[in-house]
């Protein structure tokens, strides 16, 4: 009887031992884009974008997960998440169209509004010095614009892009911002839509500061927040709960605040600091 109990006890201990050693950590597959200056995947500035900094923080603070980083286009990211592939992304806008298939974190990073970027020689066509009525620009048959397929610019801008997506003067391709910027410099498009620090980054990269102009978009909010998002699955929900705990503990810390300021000019950094607490819910 004693021997039988001993055998059972040993069996239980062995089973628990094998269960412990055989349990694999859950895995987060991070979908990242070559999207400077938010995410910079190569070159001298590699890893210095705001999304890069956030991803580094999350990987460091979530050691109980295995982490894979997978470069892909905006369009592929959107398609794979819609198909149910378990992916997460460190920077994305929360939109009604995405809610059925994505789990979103609390606001994670703050950004200034998008701008219309155009060739300087076309300046009179873009509200010379004032805010641009984007819908009027999209309606102008003699102005050709370029937008990235699968990229969300902001809810109000996305709605206009969808409305005019069938127009021949709006080119939509699954390209990087850099490619559209080169098209702009070559005169193949008249305007593109970028964030201000994104436009400045590319203008510096191509030594084109004098060749492009930037205007705000009428009616656009002055700032907008991105979130971290995962595929809407049980795993995605668990990951987002853990990410929210990390973000909630970091939002008010100076080092975390500076992630949102990366690559902005000093005057724009002041604007981000002005909007940060209210937009990000810091108390």
Indicate residue ranges for each PLM-predicted region:
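Extracytoplasmic small-molecule ligand-binding "clamshell" domains
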Residues: 24-101, 243
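Short loop->beta-strand "edge-of-pocket" segments that line small-molecule binding or catalytic clefts
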Residues: 26-41, 48, 130-153
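Periplasmic-binding protein-like
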Residues: 33-36, 111-115, 207-244, 267-282
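Short helices/loops that flank or line small-molecule/ion binding pockets
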Residues: 43, 60-61, 75-87, 177-198, ...
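Ligand-binding cleft/hinge of the Venus flytrap
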Residues: 55-63, 138-143, 147-174, 181, ...
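A ligand-binding cleft/hinge motif common to bilobed small-molecule-binding domains
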Residues: 76, 82, 91-101, 158, ...
């Amino acid at each position: 009887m004693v021997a039988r109990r001993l055998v059972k006890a040993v069996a239980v201990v062995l089973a628990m031992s094998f269960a412990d050693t055989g349990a694999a950590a859950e895995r987060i597959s991070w979908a990242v884009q070559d999207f400077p200056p938010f995410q910079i995947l190569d070159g001298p500035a590699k890893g210095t974008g705001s999304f890069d900094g956030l991803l580094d923080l999350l990987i460091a603070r979530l050691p109980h997960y295995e982490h894979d980083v997978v470069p892909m286009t905006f369009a592929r990211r959107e398609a794979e998440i819609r198909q149910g592939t378990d992916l997460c992304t460190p920077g994305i806008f929360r939109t009604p169209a995405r809610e059925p298939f994505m789990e979103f974190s609390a606001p994670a990073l703050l950004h200034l509004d998008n701008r219309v970027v155009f060739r300087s020689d076309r300046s009179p066509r873009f509200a010379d010095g004032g805010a641009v009525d984007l819908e009027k620009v999209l309606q102008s048959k003699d102005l050709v614009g370029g937008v990235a397929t699968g990229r969300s610019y902001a809810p109000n801008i996305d709605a206009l892009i969808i409305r005019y997506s069938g127009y021949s003067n709006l080119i939509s391709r699954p390209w990087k911002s850099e490619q559209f910027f080169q098209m702009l410099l070559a005169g193949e498009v008249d305007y593109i839509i970028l964030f201000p620090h994104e436009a400045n980054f590319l203008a510096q990269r191509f030594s084109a500061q004098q060749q492009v102009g930037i205007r705000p978009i009428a009616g656009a909010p002055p700032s907008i927040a991105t979130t971290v998002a995962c595929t809407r699955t049980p795993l995605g929900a668990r990951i987002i709960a853990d990410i929210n705990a990390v973000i909630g503990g970091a939002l008010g810390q100076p080092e975390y605040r500076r992630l949102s300021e990366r690559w902005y000019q000093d005057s724009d950094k002041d604007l981000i600091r002005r909007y940060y607490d209210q937009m990000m819910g810091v108390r």
